[in-house]
């Protein structure tokens, strides 16, 4: 599920979702 952004600390998030805190 792509909600929009997720934790940049999570490697899985960066590979499946957008990184939050830009």
Curated annotation (Swiss-Prot):
Pharmacophore key residues, as annotated region: 14-16, 18-19
Main location: secreted
Residues that make up the propeptide removed upon maturation: 1-2
Keywords: Amidation, Cleavage on pair of basic residues, Disulfide bond, Ion channel impairing toxin, Neurotoxin, Secreted, Toxin, Voltage-gated sodium channel impairing toxin
GO cellular component terms attached to this protein's record: extracellular region
Signal peptide (UniProt feature, chain positions): none
Compartments reported by the entry: Secreted
Site, Pharmacophore key residue: residue positions: 7, 12
Effect of residue 5 to A: Structure similar to wild-type toxin, even with this disulfide bond deletion
Name of the featured protein: Mu-conotoxin KIIIB
């Amino acid at each position: 599920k792509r909600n929009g952004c997720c934790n940049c600390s999570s490697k899985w998030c960066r590979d499946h979702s957008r990184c939050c805190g830009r």
